[in-house]
Amino acid sequence: MKKIFFLLIYFYFALSQSIYNHPELEWRTFETEHFIFHFHDETENTAREAATVAEYIYKPITDLYDYEPPEKTTIIIKDTDDYANGAAYSFDNKIEIWALPLAMDLRGAHRWIQNVITHEFVHIIQIQASIKYSINVPGGFLQFIGYEDEKREDVLYGYPDQIISYPFPGIIIPPWLAEGTAQYMYDGANFDFLDSHRDMIIRDRILNDNLLTFSEMNSFGKRGIGNESIYNQGFSFVKWLTSIYGSDINRAISNEISKPFQFSISKALKNITGFDGNELYEQWSSYLKKDYSEKIGHLKDEVSGEIIEDTGDVNIYPTWSPNGKSYAFLSNRENDYFSQTNLYICQVNNKNAKKIAERVESKPSWINNNHLVYSRRSKINKNGSVFFDIYKYNLNLQEETRLTVNGRYTSPLVLKGKDQIIAFKTIDGSTNIYISDVNFIDFQRITEIDNGTVLFSATYDMNNNLLYIDGNDLHGRQLYTLDMETYDLNKISNPGWDTRNPNFHKNSLCYSVDKSGIFNIICEKDEKKSYAIIHSVKCINPHESAKKDNVRELERLPTFESRQSIWENYANKNGIPWRWDIIEYESVPLSVKSEVVVQSDTGAPNDPVPVE
């Protein structure tokens, strides 16, 4: 029995290691002047772009902090899960990047590899430049242990009854500083910026006197959009500091907190600027209050309606059933974090939302009044990966059916009148569109995208047999059309603005755009392009529309607190006119334009070779 027990333990740990290491993948390695890249065959395009970007940003970042790593930095590129993130391990001088681009509803869209490589390498350099002792010594402590008096002669020491420990951290970088500098990057960098979403969250907190305090910015562990607010406020605070003291203050802070006996970021700031952390925070927050008061002073009264879903911190992607008696939406009610969304169905006549599926993150689509399809993360597979799959739910039977296995499909859309379904799949950082019969699932690819363009959601114009899609290839989401006869994909929106969440209904194309600096819902009716513009006042920020006849379901961030709700506005019933003037949100820049960092003709500096 004991042998079986130990055999089971050995098998468990052996299985865990094999899952973690993904032995099914063929890994390769190449080196550039300052980096070592590891990638598997399925991520070659991402690795090549990452190599170009990394060498491009190496000198500006190391010059800013006057610091270079002691050896080449290792960058690992992987696409083993439907998960998007980057991680910097400063003491290991290593970066991990997932090839899947991050798609967060409360952040603007930026070219993923340019953004994440620069962001994580700033973490590497800033943290290493701020270490007090050595890259091999993350910290230490002094400890005293007291013992009871010995009771017997044959006992050398009594039982320990006292312990005193005093830690000496090797690094003291608070979250706002780490994330603020990583988003600031360096002078002239435009791979990330304070876009309309970040501006919206800070504006909401300022106008409702809910800005995180200096102390609250020093720690994560917050629910809702609290952690995201640390990113936003840190970014804004660092930008303000550099505007007052120059970008060299980033290096000065690292130099100051690297001193062996400097354990306070507030005192470090005082030694550099003459003001402690709280004093600088008050100056920055006063600047924001004045700035936002001036920006919104000319805005007219808001167009608003009755809130119909506000439980939880986020309620998004409302989608009407064909008969208009129910709607589906995603919500994080009963959960703590923004990304923990589940799928709910609500009948209009009773208003009681019922959860039907967990771990759903993209917009669902109705097949008919009793069936809908959606994408959600499936359970871990035999290789240790977690992928998105398409599922169908029968409302009559209250039964879920899995339609794909390890499919990696998101944002399914049923094409009205065609008995077909399309979905997106993102591999190696690029999204392609797949189509299948809705009754016999067998997805076939209909686009050939390999340039890092990412697609998010779609809507169907049955009359013209067109898909309207929002996607990203540089900065901000853009609108595309896909001809369902020729499969030609064309960008149709202004690249200077972020245009997203299209919805086509009865010859009207509605979408959200930040042309004024605040997102507004715009509707183009027929080809005459008459506009219904719902302008946003103060913190209100509509993102998406789901039209039902003359009813518009919108998502917004309400003025009274930082959470997203679904609200409805009866245009004809309340006598609200079909046309509003665009209200410019002054002093807010449009999306920053930049040239894509183009890889060399030969790709990576060295040809990839298998890992020995």
What are these model-predicted stretches?
Residues 16-167:
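Juxtacatalytic substrate-recognition/specificity segment
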Residues 18-20, 26-29, 223-229, 253-371, ...:
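Beta/coil-rich, acidic/histidine-enriched accessory regions frequently appended to metallopeptidases
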Residues 21-23, 92-94, 112-116, 128-244, ...:
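Acidic/His/Gly-enriched intrinsically disordered linker/tail segments
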Residues 277-308, 312-317, 524-612:
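Pro/Ala/Gly-rich low-complexity, hydrophilic intrinsically disordered segments
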Residues 304-309, 351-357, 398-404, 442-448, ...:
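A short beta-strand motif characteristic of beta-propeller blades
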Residues 311-313, 331-343, 356-361, 375-391, ...:
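A flexible loop/linker signature enriched in serine peptidases of the S9 family
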Residues 318-326, 364-371, 412-419, 458-465, ...:
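Blade-terminus and WD-like Trp-Asp/Gly-His loop motifs, strongest in beta-propeller folds
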Residues 347-351, 394-398, 437-441, 483-487, ...:
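Short loop/turn segments that connect beta-strands within beta-propeller blades
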